[in-house]
Each structure stands twice: as C-alpha cells, then as structure tokens.
Amino acid sequence: SGNLAVEAEVERIEVLIKKEMTDLDAAEGWIKDNSKWDSIADHWLRIGAHYKGVDAEVNLKKHNSLIANLLYLIDDLAYAHHLGKLGLIEATYANWRNLLFIAEYIGQARALGMGVVSKGFCSSVLRIQLNHLLVKIESNISPSWTESTQQDFRTFLKVIKEQVITDTPSITPAEYFKLATGCIEHVLSEFDRKVEKIQ
C-alpha cells in the first residue's frame, strides 16, 4: 500500500519468514525433493527483492499467488504423509485446511484495506472486493472458537463495514493492520492446535 506506518512490522515479518525458510531449507526429508517448495522459495526471494518498487495491486497479486502455492504444498505434504488415510483425522482434515483459507481471506482483506486506509479513499471495485472477503470471513467464524476470538473477528468485520468501506475511511493504517493481524494470528493458533492433535 506504500504506507510507511507499518514498514517496521513488515520488516519484522520478513525476518521471521526468512528464518523459517532457512530452517526448512536445512531440513532433511520430503520437502528437499519437492519442486513446489523450490518454486515458492524462489518466488518469495523475487517478491522480497522487488516489492518496494511495484504498486500495491501487483504486490497483492504476487502474494495471493504465493499463498495459493503454499496451500498446494500443504496439500502435497498431507498426501505424502498419508494424513487423509488416518481415520481419526479424516473429518478434521477439511477443518484445519479451511483455517488456512480463512487466514488467506483475512490477509487479502488486510492488504486491500491497508491500501484504502492509507489513501483515505475506497473505490467501488475495492468495496466489492472487501465485501466479498467480508462475507467469506464472516461465514467461517466458528462457534467453537473462544468468545474473545469471535469478538475480535466481529470487531474486525465491523471496522471493515463502518471505517474502511466508506466514503472517508476513518481508521489509521496501523490500527487496521493490528486488528487484521490479530485475527490472522487467532486462526493460525487454531490451526496449530488442530495439527498438534494429528501429531
């Protein structure tokens, strides 16, 4: 979005991702031989080298493509380790996989919303895109999540409706980024809990 208010947070996340990728590159086994992983690592390096020089829409498309490829890699991982064949997790497989898609919807809403609140303007195209994501996120809020998590999601969705998809967006980029990131973290924590049950 070109907003400098969250630049430090973006750089912090870049460092974390770089560490995780280095750890994965050093790991032995299945991922070393997976061409999708090589492609993802290369794609990430190219994004990291050029994201500051391209506009937000191009960055969003590149990140969406990267995330889609990560989700395919996770499917390959589940298949390679026969996770779908274990009776106890067949029912939960779609559930933990769905959590990753929810995180992606929130990530897209975060990226689009950051563009809106940074510019102080929401175009009709962005309203449609954000409303579409809002519906996807809202329909996936699970009653099994803690009340505080559900409340954070309701707050985030209310902010999108009332402070982002308006003629004059009224939330600061830093506040919006923090709200969206908090929801992503809730979903990823839930994902971690589901995966721990499988292990």
List PLM regions with ranges.
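Hydrophobic alpha-helical segments
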Residues: 1-199
